[in-house]
Curated annotation (Swiss-Prot):
Localization: Cytoplasm
Pfam family, one: NTP_transf_3
Keywords associated with the record: Cytoplasm, GTP-binding, Magnesium, Metal-binding, Molybdenum cofactor biosynthesis, Nucleotide-binding, Transferase
Function: Transfers a GMP moiety from GTP to Mo-molybdopterin (Mo-MPT) cofactor (Moco or molybdenum cofactor) to form Mo-molybdopterin guanine dinucleotide (Mo-MGD) cofactor.
Protein known as: Molybdenum cofactor guanylyltransferase
Subunit structure: Monomer.
Cofactors (names): Mg(2+)
Record GO cellular component, one term: cytoplasm
EC numbers, comma separated: 2.7.7.77
GO biological process: bis(molybdopterin guanine dinucleotide)molybdenum biosynthetic process
Highest taxon above the source species: Bacteria
Gene3D superfamilies: Spore Coat Polysaccharide Biosynthesis Protein SpsA, Chain A
Residues that coordinate or bind GTP: L11, C12, G13, K23, D66, D97
Length: 191
């Protein structure tokens, strides 16, 4: 299996409360962070989609909107909505605020898609990264079951589903732009 046979979905629906503004629209090199991620991953994957609660991008991207079945704002709802759009395949899911994840990290996770796992996510010494990994579309119903029990964290899946945590030593590749200072620092590194 090759990366260019797979689909990628960039999650853009977070509240961005720590950042104080919508992270998906932060500007990097004359484009917003969403466009930055879509451009990068379009060179790697078959198709790149954007997941959000509503179309805040004026039809600029292939959009997967959150399901209206549940009136919550959560990663589990986003994952359920994403996986419901695909049939019998793995989908790479990444949050928009992880701009340093690239092909090297993907290639390290890729071989585990051929094994007996339904979830393959990145893990560093300090964190598991549930919003950086491959999820099998067959998990949509499991996500729905958790939503019906009002369990919103993707981490609940790991205890029920065969999950591979792919170990990475370098925390830097998994930087999350949670605060404005982190965004400013990353922006200055791009120059």
């Amino acid at each position: 299996m090759q990366l260019n046979e797979l689909n990628c979905v960039i999650l853009c629906g977070g509240k961005s409360s720590r950042m104080g503004q919508d992270k998906s629209k932060l500007i990097l090199k004359n484009q917003n962070l969403t466009q930055f991620q879509v451009n990068k991953f379009s060179k790697i994957f078959k198709n790149v989609y954007v997941s959000a609660k509503e179309d805040k991008f004026e039809n600029h991207f292939n959009l997967i909107k959150d399901s209206l079945e549940f009136e919550v704002y959560s990663p589990m709802l986003a994952l359920y909505s994403i996986l419901s759009n695909f049939k019998n395949e793995f989908v790479f899911v990444l949050s928009v605020d992880s701009p340093k994840v690239g092909e090297n990290e993907l290639l390290k996770m890729l071989p585990f898609l051929e094994q007996n796992y339904k979830i393959i996510i990145a893990k560093t010494p300090l964190h598991k990264h549930p919003l950086c990994g491959f999820y099998h579309s067959s998990l949509a119903q499991t996500c729905k079951n958790f939503l019906e029990k009002n369990e919103q964290k993707i981490g609940f899946l790991f205890s029920e589903i065969k999950t591979k945590f792919v170990e990475f030593e370098n925390e830097d590749a998994f930087l999350n732009l949670n605060f404005y200072e982190e965004y400013e620092k990353f922006k200055s590194e791009l120059k």
